[in-house]
Design a protein with these regions (language model features):
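Conserved beta-propeller blade repeats
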Residues: 1-17, 42-62, 82, 86-106, ...
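A short local loop/turn or secondary-structure capping micro-motif enriched for an aromatic residue
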Residues: 3-5, 23-25, 45-46, 68-69, ...
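Beta-propeller blade-edge and WD-like acidic-aromatic loop motif
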Residues: 13, 17-39, 58, 62-83, ...
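Interface/linker segment at the passenger-translocator junction
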Residues: 172-180
Length: 180
């Protein structure tokens, strides 16, 4: 079985998460339906929501390990490029800005899931949303001016579109540890 596909920027293949028994791995699914493993992970790690960087060189993933879920950036061959978050928060749903300078994700670091953004060059972390019901699955527009995400409300899950004005974000300082 394959799940959570991410189309490569050139449109030639997908990166998918594969599961077998208690292990999961990343695989490349080509247009001709051939599938080749990219990276296998031990039983202590669970990979989710891979997404290609705009230049196609990297994948951002959410990885569950040692009781927490963090954001990692992998090379296309599945080797670790950088660990983005490393703290007690559960971080998931990575999404790149179209220029590759920002990585957005949802996190429960305040007790409620909201959208955060990290400027990869400076390692500065910002809280982008502040909603009571939780915010998930960020999707920045190609021009960076709009952010769409899922949010819980009294009606269930809603799709919310908001201005992506960085002047409205709350700066949360630098990441807990330097990016690897």
């Amino acid at each position: 079985r394959a799940r959570q596909p991410s189309l490569s920027p050139d449109g030639r293949d997908l990166i998918v998460v594969r599961n077998k028994l208690q292990e999961n791995w990343l695989a490349k699914l080509s247009i001709d339906q051939t599938m080749e493993p990219v990276a296998e992970f031990d039983r202590n790690a669970q990979i989710a929501t891979p997404v290609h960087s705009p230049d196609g060189r990297h994948l951002a993933v959410s990885m569950w390990r040692d009781g927490v879920r963090d954001i990692w950036i992998l090379n296309q061959d599945g080797t670790v490029y950088r660990r983005v978050t490393a703290d007690g928060a559960h971080d998931m749903d990575p999404a790149w800005s179209s220029d590759g300078r920002w990585l957005y994700f949802s996190s429960d670091r305040t007790g409620i899931f909201n959208i955060y953004g990290v400027e990869l060059e400076t390692e500065r972390l910002y809280q982008v949303t502040n909603v009571l019901g939780g915010a998930f699955h960020p999707a920045p527009s190609p021009n960076g001016q709009t952010l769409v995400f899922e949010s819980f409300s009294h009606n269930g899950m809603d799709i919310v579109s908001t201005s992506n004005g960085r002047d409205q974000w709350s700066e949360r300082g630098v990441l807990a540890q330097p990016l690897e």
